[in-house]
Amino acid sequence: MKITKIEKKKRLYLIELDNDDSLYVTEDTIVRFMLSKDKVLDNDQLEDMKHFAQLSYGKNLALYFLSFQQRSNKQVADYLRKHEIEEHIIADIITQLQEEQWIDDTKLADTYIRQNQLNGDKGPQVLKQKLLQKGIASHDIDPILSQTDFSQLAQKVSQKLFDKYQEKLPPKALKDKITQALLTKGFSYDLAKHSLNHLNFDQDNQEIEDLLDKELDKQYRKLSRKYDGYTLKQKLYQALYRKGYNSDDINCKLRNYL
């Protein structure tokens, strides 16, 4: 087969053959196989060229994908599949990228966890879930998590939540709110409870009463549209109790309110 045409198309070259076949190749392919117009290729040479062309093209795609941020082996492989790179070529590309240290799942997991320690708010359970979603194996994640101290991060997150809600909730409800938020963010129950020890939940009676008055007004506006009489009183009591207010304080307020 003879090459009848070589035409540059943006980042690729169009190769046309005298058997009406055509293919796109990278500049690396042109150089490696010393391609030029009128060059004759046998079947083996053509197959070698096609394999190298897809390998070169796929690797360039992968490097472009990696130029934005670190990626896992799986993320790179999935990206190449979207661009219709063949599976055996993908395997070769992944191997090359690993050997050249462009991709490293263990390093990616370590960087991800360290960045979270600096400016994130996730606990180990959520971090592991997110890394697994990236296709990183547990054996690359677990050793790093086990060596990472999350106590200071839990304290920082709990302090931020405390500052946000301390003027809106009574002590019991505030503790429950912070604990639940930490659990949702992936911290263990023990770590969540321990982080509360560094916070001051003391509120004087007037502060608690003011919060109760405000919440009672809010719940009354909401519930009085649907209920009245004894049923309204019961609904108000239940709503306030769920918010963490003391039963005696609630009953006292309701007697004077209704």
Curated annotation (Swiss-Prot):
Protein name from the UniProt record: Regulatory protein RecX
Family membership: Belongs to the RecX family.
Origin superkingdom: Bacteria
Its biological purpose: Modulates RecA activity.
GO biological process terms on file: regulation of DNA repair
PANTHER family found in the cross-reference section: REGULATORY PROTEIN RECX FAMILY PROTEIN
Keyword annotations: Cytoplasm
Main location class: cytoplasm
Pfam family, one: RecX_HTH1
Keyword Transmembrane helix: no
Record lineage: Bacteria, Bacillati, Bacillota, Bacilli, Lactobacillales
UniProt-annotated location(s): Cytoplasm
InterPro entries according to UniProt: RecX_HTH_1st, RecX_HTH_2nd, RecX_HTH_3rd, Regulatory_RecX, WH-like_DNA-bd_sf
One GO location term (cellular component): cytoplasm
Organism: Streptococcus pyogenes serotype M28 (strain MGAS6180)
